[in-house]
A protein has these predicted regions:
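Bacterial Sec-dependent N-terminal signal peptides
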Residues: 1-10
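N-terminal substrate-binding region of glycoside hydrolase catalytic domains
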Residues: 10-87, 93-122, 128, 220
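Short loop/turn motifs at secondary-structure junctions
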Residues: 15, 52, 85, 138-139, ...
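Short, flexible loop/turn elements at secondary-structure junctions
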Residues: 23, 60-62, 147-149, 193-195, ...
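Active-site cleft segment of glycoside hydrolase catalytic domains centered on the general acid/base Glu
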Residues: 70-75, 79, 100-214
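Long, well-ordered mid-to-C-terminal structural blocks that present hydrophobic/aromatic surfaces
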Residues: 215-224
Length: 224
């Protein structure tokens, strides 16, 4: 305490123990509060750090209807995490709303774009958000390019149920990868799927990416 160390003396290194707190600002705005085991009201991220968390994940939506998880909202949460010494993962959904295995809706502003335009959209959106974070001195350790992409992304163009779709998906992942490395060369890029217990799914997606020139550093796996 009383130093410039944002970690508050907590060890934020080693194995990443993280929480996705993307709903936090919306929850706070609706009046929700957080309490420790003694019933004392606490700031959520401070309490999580005290309980052993050392990393925060934040999702990004392109133009969400109510503003939550927008670029500006993400910056506000990332700044709070940064000032507590957290390591940070940014999760790009490339959608105006939640992207999951069945729903990979294009942002409204991208709906009529060609595949080549979509690749530019991915690149510019990724660089725009990450540049804003970097300009504030915030380090980003991991970047997730797409969310639960077990059937691809930006449907129908990047849906992996056809050869062309699989090729497009690899191009989209690579567009995101290259954009990340341009802003944060040391950041680790994650391709994220759900159903971590289904080996055939991972073989299909990652063999397809490999065959079609897709680039990634880490396989992200969710198990529910």
């Amino acid at each position: 305490e009383g130093t410039d160390d944002p970690t508050g003396g907590y060890d934020m290194t080693g194995f990443a123990r993280g929480a996705d707190v993307s709903w936090l600002t919306e929850m706070e705005a609706s009046g929700r509060k957080f309490y420790d085991s003694k019933g004392k009201e606490r700031e959520c991220m401070e309490l999580l750090r005290e309980l052993g968390m050392n990393a925060i994940r934040l999702r990004v939506w392109v133009d969400p209807e109510n503003g939550w998880c927008s670029k500006e909202d993400v910056i506000a949460k990332a700044w709070r995490a940064h000032n507590l010494g957290y390591r940070l993962m940014i999760d790009f959904h490339y959608s105006d709303e939640w992207a999951d295995p069945l729903d990979q809706f294009k942002p409204v502003a991208w709906e009529d774009h060609s595949v080549e335009q979509l690749l530019e959209d991915i690149s510019s959106h990724t660089k725009d958000v990450l540049s804003a974070l970097k300009n504030l001195g915030i380090n980003v350790e991991w970047v997730q390019v797409g969310n639960e992409t077990h059937s691809g992304m930006l449907f129908p163009d990047g849906k992996t149920d056809t050869q062309t779709g699989s090729e497009n998906f690899a191009k989209m992942i690579t567009a995101g990868y290259d954009a990340v490395k341009e802003i944060y060369p040391e950041a680790q890029v994650i391709v994220h799927l759900d159903q971590g217990n289904v080996a055939s799914l991972y073989s299909r997606i990652f063999e397809g990416l490999k065959t079609n020139g897709g680039k990634w550093d880490i396989i992200g796996m969710s198990l529910y």
